[in-house]
Amino acid sequence: MRQHVNPLSRFFQLPRPLPSPEEMFAQSSRPLHLDIGCARGGFLLSLAPLQPEWNHVGVEIRHPLVLSAERDRQELELDNLRFLFCNVNVSLEEWLDALPRDQLQWVSIQFPDPWFKRRHQKRRVLQPSLLIALATALQPGRELFIQSDVLSVIEPMVMLIEQSNCFERPKNDSHAWQKANPLPVPTERERYVLDQGLQVYRRLYQRNDQQAPELSNLEALWQQVDNPSKEEHSDC
């Protein structure tokens, strides 16, 4: 059972200083994979040993999950993985701005909490300011991967990403939704959904060479995004 927290509550609006790659990793110059909303960390705990040439950072807003994930990481002695507690829409932009050029090479947002209602729009994980920060940190050709089992969760993300004009789908990807996960291990949620015979909606994007838009312009477009597939979740 997924337990939500309100990212707009006062506690989660307090900025948290995040450690730099140099503070987290002995080999800090490795390419960096950022997993936003890593939950208990099972995905990264499985991925990090398979990709020792990468550093992996998982960020999560639920502190008990981060503590649990860090304990597991330490037991496994994974030196190319760290888990951080923060509200990404409060604390991540400054951290991204400080990264060395082209260190961030892959971003994943997988099965984010489903805030359906329009009045909860600002609680969704992918906000315009975060997308612009990611687009600024990612160099052309670097990748952003999103997936969810809820169409009305991923469609607004897709619309926001595509309205930014900063990302394009790979030229050989002509399907509405990507069939296979490009990553070598699934998340816990992904395994559960597929075991139930249900669909997972996926999109892989590559950063293009377009300049990131002004925040006010993207926010204006974002206000038009209102869960096109799930009318039953809209406010009365």
Curated annotation (Swiss-Prot):
Classification via InterPro entries: SAM-dependent_MTases_sf, tRNA_(Gua-N-7)_MeTrfase_Trmb, tRNA_methyltr_TrmB_bact
Domain of life (superkingdom): Bacteria
Chain residues that bind substrate: 117, 149
Gene Ontology CC annotations of this record: tRNA methyltransferase complex
Pathway assignment: tRNA modification; N(7)-methylguanine-tRNA biosynthesis
Residues annotated for S-adenosyl-L-methionine binding in this entry: 35, 60, 87, 113
Molecular-function GO term, any one: tRNA (guanine(46)-N7)-methyltransferase activity
Catalytic activity: guanosine(46) in tRNA + S-adenosyl-L-methionine = N(7)-methylguanosine(46) in tRNA + S-adenosyl-L-homocysteine
Active-site residue numbers: 113
UniProt keyword Cell division, yes or no: no
Stored Pfam families: Methyltransf_4
Annotated Gene3D superfamilies: Vaccinia Virus protein VP39
EC number: 2.1.1.33
Keywords of this entry: Methyltransferase, S-adenosyl-L-methionine, Transferase, tRNA processing
Annotated HAMAP family: tRNA_methyltr_TrmB
Family: Belongs to the class I-like SAM-binding methyltransferase superfamily. TrmB family.
Described function: Catalyzes the formation of N(7)-methylguanine at position 46 (m7G46) in tRNA.
Protein name stated in the entry: tRNA (guanine-N(7)-)-methyltransferase
Organism expressing this protein natively: Prochlorococcus marinus (strain MIT 9313)
Gene behind this protein: trmB
